[in-house]
């Protein structure tokens, strides 16, 4: 079916963004970044420009790991949460104090600088175009969107961005995301700096302050993703690799160590 190249994403509009990079002469890293950016638009219920990122990459000679999980704002401390939320000593489940510094864009930049081939701004083009022109919302995305709307609609800014008609989009309805398109263009033009030191960073910090949150421009500007050595485990003739903690991959390796003690083939399917 495939000669040499393939791109797979959970949403059918994500893969063409990656393929476009391959057709333009880009490599697998270019394709992965473009597809990831597109997924923040077409599956906003599962992805976002404010999300984290982890990556394990084989360059043909060496295995690399990248941890771009969000760091806590410097203002977070047990005392901070005691003062704002009574006896609570950890972040709340929702609201401005439930968010950490976004890591995904920094991961895209770091991967591109080390392994990418095409210009960084080209990698953001497909996602920005989809956000501007819109896309038809598929059933699975719509179901998650509608399920989360009742709990999230009271969050500041959520209704304006994700419930433009006062409700979640219907299946097959065209959804446009102009604010995300503008953000992607700013990220593209500044090689990601807009999110950490530029206009988007200032807007994020101002919004957090307005809502009484702890996130500051200093938190955003000081953020850096971390290159790490993947951890691994041999299992029945295979070697599996994961990002070390704070990633959760170590749990999978521990589980494999437990499973290795059992003769799974002798057990019933259920």
Language model regions located:
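Noncatalytic scaffold domains of N-terminal-nucleophile
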Residues: 1-20, 28-197, 201-247, 264-267
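Flexible, polar/acidic helix-loop-strand segments at domain edges
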Residues: 250
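Structured C-terminal helix/loop/strand segments within mature extracytoplasmic catalytic/sensor domains
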Residues: 258-270
